[in-house]
């Protein structure tokens, strides 16, 4: 790979993303596809761009990303986490701004398991008084 690149691993729910950043023109490639092609939802594209827009490096870095597992929202969150970690490796002075925005912390929320005797994780069967 290129000699002047930085790497970050991001995770969210059951998704895992590997992010490589290097100086360039702002091209974002996810699993060999453009950002706009990979994510149909505008919200997912916004989530991916958030850390770059915060530190104003949107058009100065090229991103090469591979992401596996989970759905659209989980993958977008994993990519955001990975980009954040790669940016901190690229320039440690960006850490306070990224931390203040809440991008550094790994979102530990997971799907709650279904319990025996219940319909879903918390949904109880309808109560019948008589």
Swiss-Prot record:
Gene Ontology CC annotations of this record: cytosolic small ribosomal subunit
InterPro entries: Ribosomal_Su5_D2-typ_SF, Ribosomal_uS9, Ribosomal_uS9_bac/plastid, Ribosomal_uS9_CS, Ribsml_uS5_D2-typ_fold_subgr
UniProt-listed Gene3D superfamilies: 3.30.230.10
GO molecular function annotations of the record: RNA binding; structural constituent of ribosome
One Pfam family hit: Ribosomal_S9
An individual GO BP term: translation
Entry keyword set: Ribonucleoprotein, Ribosomal protein
Family per record: Belongs to the universal ribosomal protein uS9 family.
Name this protein carries in UniProt: Small ribosomal subunit protein uS9
Organism: Haemophilus influenzae (strain PittEE)
The encoding gene: rpsI
